[in-house]
């Protein structure tokens, strides 16, 4: 409905000089909503007012009492319509506010979050209010005419509203809450892929949620996409949004489309789930990247402490970036599979961080591990850079499902679509590239085909690659490798003084403290010992020589080693009092062993030839499976799709140099004449 959107957009002409261009939406959007609701309520307005007047002084639940009469999940009890407000120029401000206050609370909430009264006051101050009211009062946004024929359907109105949003985002410097339509089209195309029952069965009803709804773009495009294939299907839309104005836009968009506005909630999803008992057939989101979750930390940690009963049981990412928490939230909201039926699917946009951030055992790695172990990860699509309005970084579409078909179980499909776009004629913020319909269709085909792809278009240069992996491919074990501590021992004056000043020394029993002090005093300050056993024997002998009968205990000997030892790679491996070789924390290393590979075989092949004195720390085990080596996960697109390009041959390089030299000499001769 571009024509309808253009008609409404023309009203912005009245705002020039009074408002900045990026402020137009504060006027145009709420007035569009106001006029649409005014029009659709017109046929039942008088009946609603009669019922309201009869009970207005009684304690009635007006929502339950009046919505059946209005025919919508909202109503208006005021005596004003927008054309009626336009009839009284002197009272336009007060009458308009009275009209707004006459709406049911769910609609007033939208205008409140828009800050609409403040906008009305500014319009009045700039002498634009009456002109704007008059212009919108003349705009026909009726759903049906007097004969019952459609004028502007909910679908038409929704498309027009979306077109207006797109126009406003084109002139806005921000656009953070707006996911580009081409990205959404790809997301919902893949999300619905294979669900023939949804796309073809008349009367089918499904639910869809977005926990970071923004202006509702993902939800509205999903509904439109579904209706292209099945206009008799119903997709019930749910969303939650933190920012007040974007929440108001989203709720208004859903209202205009005939959705239940109660399904759009305002608030931080991480802090509180506003749809606590609702699960979804589909979910899609573009959560913020690199935004810390500190404001919701208390609530998140309480949820995590609930274990499986909470939303964040698998793990918590670093406080600096909460995007993986939104994925966990969505996983907790998937429609469960019951006796092979039901289940849910998720599409979510992430940057590169959730693919590989976090070491083995860390929060991010544990979240990936949980998703992979439960076989929820279906596919990840790498998108081109420069696809979003507010960032040019690489982004990825994750597709998650608890109802994977048999042929996809235990498998993960990676699609490299970073070469599948074309440059836009005009940049929108940082967005320089977009998906064409052909790009989307080809990526969706690669998803549906579920097999290796290596495609290149000779004319455009666009490329598409895909590979199928076993889910275990993305697991590894972090095995700790130790090497011996090698020290020489010498009782220098400085070392002895430091030993005697240590609090641990002063806390030794009197007999042991005196024995240690006497023994180190008897040592030759110039003597150097490169073997720990020899040094301990000398120390014990010195104590005995001083008349101390009781052998020095483990604690004094440990203190002596701490202060009288200096690292020396030429010394023998240092042992403790039990004869066990001590490891050197400074030489400690880790090897990342592919999951399933025998760690001893790996050690013999990759470590022992380089460090013959090294050994595996078998006390470093995974908390879950109890085996040596902590389990970690990562999904490295660069490695999986890396293509080795051999260096040019010496002959080729030599020929190029000779060619350049010849050109240079020809140029010199030309200059010399």
List each model region and its residues.
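Non-catalytic, mostly N-terminal accessory regions of nucleic-acid modification and defense proteins
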Residues: 1-196, 263-271, 382-385, 409-416, ...
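Short, contiguous acidic/charged loop-to-helix segments that flank catalytic cores in large enzymes
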Residues: 18, 294-303, 308-322, 353-363, ...
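Flexible, glycine-/basic-rich loop-and-beta segments that form/coincide
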Residues: 389-494
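Feature representing long, continuous alpha-helical segments
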Residues: 220, 248, 285-287, 324-332, ...
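Active-site catalytic pocket residues across diverse enzymes, especially alpha/beta-hydrolases
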Residues: 41, 226, 230, 334
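Conserved Class I SAM-dependent methyltransferase catalytic core
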Residues: 7-8, 14, 20-36, 187, ...
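Conserved S-adenosyl-L-methionine
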Residues: 176-285, 289-302, 324, 351-353, ...
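Short acidic (Asp/Glu) and glycine-rich catalytic loops that position anionic groups and cofactors
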Residues: 166, 260-264, 304-310, 345-354, ...
């Amino acid at each position: 409905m571009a024509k309808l959107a253009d008609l409404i957009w023309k009203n912005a002409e009245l705002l020039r000089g009074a408002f900045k261009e990026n402020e137009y939406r504060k006027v145009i959007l709420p007035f569009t909503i106001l006029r649409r609701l005014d029009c659709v309520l017109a046929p039942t307005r008088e009946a609603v007012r009669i019922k309201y007047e009869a009970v207005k002084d009684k304690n009635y639940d007006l929502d339950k009492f009046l919505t059946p009469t209005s025919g919508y999940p909202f109503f208006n009890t005021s005596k004003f319509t927008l054309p009626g407000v336009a009839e009284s120029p002197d009272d336009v401000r007060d009458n308009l506010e009275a009209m707004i206050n006459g709406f049911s609370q769910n609609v007033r909430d939208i205008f409140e979050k828009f800050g609409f009264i403040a906008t009305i006051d500014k319009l009045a101050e700039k002498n634009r209010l009456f002109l704007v009211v008059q212009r919108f009062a003349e705009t026909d946004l009726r759903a049906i005419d007097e004969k019952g024929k459609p004028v502007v359907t909910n679908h038409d109105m929704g498309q027009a509203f979306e077109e207006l949003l797109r126009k406003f985002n084109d002139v806005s410097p921000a656009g953070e809450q707006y996911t580009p339509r081409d990205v959404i089209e790809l997301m919902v195309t893949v999300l619905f892929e294979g669900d023939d029952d949804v796309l073809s069965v008349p009367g089918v009803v499904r639910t869809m949620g977005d926990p970071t709804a923004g202006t509702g773009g993902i939800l509205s495009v999903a509904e439109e996409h579904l209706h292209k294939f099945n206009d008799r299907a119903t997709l019930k839309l749910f969303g939650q949004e933190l920012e007040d104005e974007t929440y108001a836009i989203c709720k208004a968009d859903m209202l205009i489309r005939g959705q239940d506005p109660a399904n759009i909630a305002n608030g931080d999803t991480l802090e509180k789930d506003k749809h606590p008992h609702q699960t979804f057939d589909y979910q899609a989101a573009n959560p913020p990247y690199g935004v810390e979750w500190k404001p919701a930390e208390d609530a998140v940690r309480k949820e995590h402490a609930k274990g499986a009963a909470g939303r964040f049981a698998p793990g918590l990412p670093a406080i600096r970036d909460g995007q993986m928490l939104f994925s966990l939230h969505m996983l907790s909201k998937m429609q469960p599979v019951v006796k092979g039926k039901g289940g849910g699917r998720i599409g979510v946009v992430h940057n590169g961080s959730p693919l590989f951030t976090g070491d083995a055992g860390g929060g991010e790695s544990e979240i990936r591990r949980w998703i992979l172990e439960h076989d929820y990860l279906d596919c990840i699509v790498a998108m081109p850079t420069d696809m979003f309005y507010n960032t040019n970084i690489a982004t990825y579409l994750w597709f998650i499902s608890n109802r994977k078909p048999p042929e996809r179980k235990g498998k993960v499909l990676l699609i490299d679509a970073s070469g599948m776009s074309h440059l836009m004629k005009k940049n929108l913020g940082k967005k320089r590239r977009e998906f064409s319909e052909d790009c989307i269709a080809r990526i969706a085909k690669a998803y549906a085909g579920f097999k290796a792809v290596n495609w290149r278009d000779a004319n455009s240069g666009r490329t598409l690659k895909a590979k199928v992996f076993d889910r275990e491919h993305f697991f590894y074990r972090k095995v700790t490798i130790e090497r011996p501590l090698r020290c020489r021992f010498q009782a220098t004056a400085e070392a002895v003084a430091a030993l005697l000043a240590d609090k641990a020394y002063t806390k030794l029993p009197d007999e042991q403290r005196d024995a240690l002090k006497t023994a180190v005093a008897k040592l030759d300050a110039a003597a150097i010992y490169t073997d720990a056993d020899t040094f301990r024997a000398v120390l014990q002998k010195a104590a005995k020589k001083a008349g101390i009968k009781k052998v020095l205990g483990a604690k004094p000997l440990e203190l002596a080693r701490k202060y009288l030892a200096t690292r020396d790679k030429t010394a023998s491996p240092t042992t403790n009092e039990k004869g066990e070789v001590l490891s050197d924390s400074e030489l400690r290393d880790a090897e990342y062993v592919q999951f399933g590979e025998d760690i001893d075989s790996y050690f013999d092949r990759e470590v022992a030839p380089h460090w013959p004195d090294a050994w595996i720390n078998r006390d470093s085990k995974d908390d879950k499976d109890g085996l040596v080596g902590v389990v970690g996960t990562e999904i490295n697109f660069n490695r999986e799709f890396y293509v080795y390009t051999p260096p040019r041959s010496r002959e080729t390089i030599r020929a190029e140099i000779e060619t350049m030299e010849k050109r240079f000499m020809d140029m010199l001769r030309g200059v010399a004449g």
